[in-house]
Amino acid sequence: MVQSPPPPAPPDSSVVKVSPTTAQTSGDRARFAVHMTLQHKGGVTKSFCANCLAQYYQATGRVASVLDADPTNKTLAAYKALNVRSVDIMKDDNNIDTRKFDDLIEAFVTEDNDFIVDNGATNFLPFISYLVANSAASILADNGRRLVLHIPLVGGEALNETMVGFDDIAKAFATDVQIVVWLNEAAKGVISLNGKNFEESRSYERNKGKILGLIRVPYHTSELFGQDMETILSKKLTFAQAIESPDTRLMSKQRLKQMQREIFEQISAVI
């Protein structure tokens, strides 16, 4: 069984404070949630999405078990400040270890807290197949848990592949899921589909009933924003750690606070 991590330390003054919205404290959103990052292509910021979610939970004093289920690249687990637990649900033949996955689902429905689960590209197909074949989303819903799938889209050459991934995931889950689309323009450029934004696409129109919300990671014209973000990602630092560090220059701290605020405010509005 997966055990809950210890409650996070009280947030420090460097962290942007976000108050819960009305939507977060009423109706469906009051139930425990299982957040999973999914995308069939590697290197498209899945771990970044999980990382930001975990930081948001920590900053707002909400409790979540943060799990890294990527069998090959334990990116999220490298963030020591986030109390990430590495879980191994794959066998040597790259198939799901059903017993371990059963235990994971059991933890989702018995532990009284949210979960954040980061998945990799290599376990994408077996992971999806298990969830669908075992009606995992319905099981979670029947036990008062929401399954929230976080799907990143990035610009540039990877846009079409990530759009295909989004369509495949949305199609695989007919009911009992909510989808959060991360439009990460900071990673590989502006997300534009034949001159149209994502909200004007056929993919969005087909699946908007399942979409809980969009989180846009904006592209900043000043390359210094990108450099500051790359620094904390390469050093596996949270926003709070970097902002509090005496090694971080004053204007870098200001840019990091701005990026943190942009992301956290959108997470607050969505989840």
PLM region descriptions:
Residues N123-Q227:
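Conserved catalytic-core segment of NTP-binding enzymes
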Residues S26-M36, A59, V63-F124:
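Nucleotide-state-sensitive switch-loop elements of NTP-binding domains
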Residues S47-C52, M163-D167:
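Short amphipathic alpha-helical segment that frequently serves as the phosphate-/nucleotide-binding helix
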Residues Q227-I271:
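NTP-binding/hydrolysis catalytic cores, primarily Walker-type P-loop NTPases
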Residues A50, D97-F101, T162:
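Amphipathic coiled-coil/heptad-repeat helices and related helical stalk/stem segments
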Residues M1-M36, D103:
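Extreme N-terminal, non-catalytic leader segments
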Residues M36-N51:
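Glycine-rich phosphate-binding P-loop
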